[in-house]
C-alpha cells in the first residue's frame, strides 16, 4: 500500500532530523524548474505565487539561495502545515517511521514525487500555479505522466489523500487496472455533507499516522479508522472512493 498527500506551504529546515535524508527522484527537473524561477524578477515571482509582499520577500530569498548541493530536510519533517502536524512524524515509533518511509509519497510542484524522507529545501511552487513554466503550459503539462509512472511502477494499491489540485497530476493517466482509492472526510453543514478544508487536512494526517502504525494495512484497516469522530459510510462510498463522515 502507498499513500499520497499534498505538500504544505509552510516549511521548516532541520539540520538534525530524526532520519537521514534520501535522494530525490527528479534532480534534473528540479534544476530546470528552479532555473526558470531564478530567471524571473521578484515582481514576476510574486505574480506566479499570488502571495503577500512579506511572503514574496521570504520566498524570493529562498529561490536565490536554492542549491541542490545543500543537504535538505526529510520531506515529512520539512512541511509544517496542519496535515503534517496531525501526522506527527516526529513522535512516531521507530517501526512507524520505517513504515512511513516505505509507504508515504508527497506530490510537489517543484520536486514532482517525493518519498517521505527525500531531502528537500524550502521553496514555494504550487502544482496549480498559473502560467507557463520551463517551456510548458503549466506544471501539469511539465510533469506529464512521469509522476503517475513513478507511483504505479510497482503496481501497489495507492490511497489518495491529496487535494484535487495535486491528485490531478495523477488522475488523467489512471487505467482500469490501477488500484486507486480516494478518501474523503466530510461533515454536515446546513443539512448537507461537505468537505471542510482544514478539518480534512487534519483527518488526512491522522489517517496517514494510523496506517503507518499498522504493519500490514488493508482496505479493511482504512474502513476501521475512527480518529476524530469520523466513521466510514458504506452507503456513500464506492470501490474507488471511501467517504468518512464526522459524528
Swiss-Prot record:
GO biological process: response to hydroperoxide
One protein family per Pfam: H2O2_YaaD
Coiled-coil regions listed in the entry: none
Source species, domain of life: Bacteria
Record-level GO cellular component terms: cytosol
Family: Belongs to the UPF0246 family.
PANTHER family noted in UniProt: PEROXIDE STRESS RESISTANCE PROTEIN YAAA, PEROXIDE STRESS RESPONSE PROTEIN YAAA
HAMAP family reported for this sequence: UPF0246
Protein name (database record): UPF0246 protein LAF_1150
